[in-house]
Amino acid sequence: MTVTEQKIILYLVSQIHKDDDDFKMYSLPIQHFYELLGYRGSPKYSEMRDITRNLIKKILEIKEGKKLKQMSWISYVEYDEHSGRVYLSFDPRLKPYLLQLKKEFTTYRLKNVMELKSGYSIRIYEILKRWQFINDVKIPLDELRKMVGATDKYLEKRVLAPAQKEITEKTDLSFEYKEVKSGRKVVAIRFFIRERPMGEASVISEIPHETSGIDVLYSPFLSRFCRARPAAAAKGVRKDRGAGATSVRRGLAR
């Protein structure tokens, strides 16, 4: 997924409430939707149509045992120039994954990711937010690659370092990280996470009032698929507690 497509999905997820039993038709003013996508000025319908048309074509592949399911993120988009609103809805087949996994959801403020320009930064932020109260989390390298959708061997240079700079400047978190080695081989990345008052961060651009204060309901399922190609979910994340470590299993088996 592109960064813009990720932000559309995050906005829709932010509209889900933990007590919802069904998807709704989600809407917002077209002007706000245009700004949400990172544009300024008067909305250009051709640009928005191209973005949502491409998003509807994005296919998820979900493997559950012997079954392979294919579905779209979005099943319907409507631009109503008379009311000045855009309407979007999830594919109803996503209900078991986004509604019935409520207990795995972690909330964060939508405005904390809307200014991020890198898809990697968004995914790293979500990972950190999930573990922010642990403060110190170690993630095996192969699992981290799957979680962020990074196949490039230059993970530190192209993913971690840029994400660290952008997240620190624009969100409520900062983090340090270091490589964990076995011999000469890097086998894991250890993150040291710190929550920051938003006043410490650079000034965040104005975000429409309908989207700035709402929470995103983040789940491992969402992080698993918000990237260009669907990939397997990380099978476990180890969180360090003194000398021992607890393995936490999330997501669907591949």
Predicted regions: what is each one?
Residues 1-233, 245-251:
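Charged, alpha-helix-forming regions
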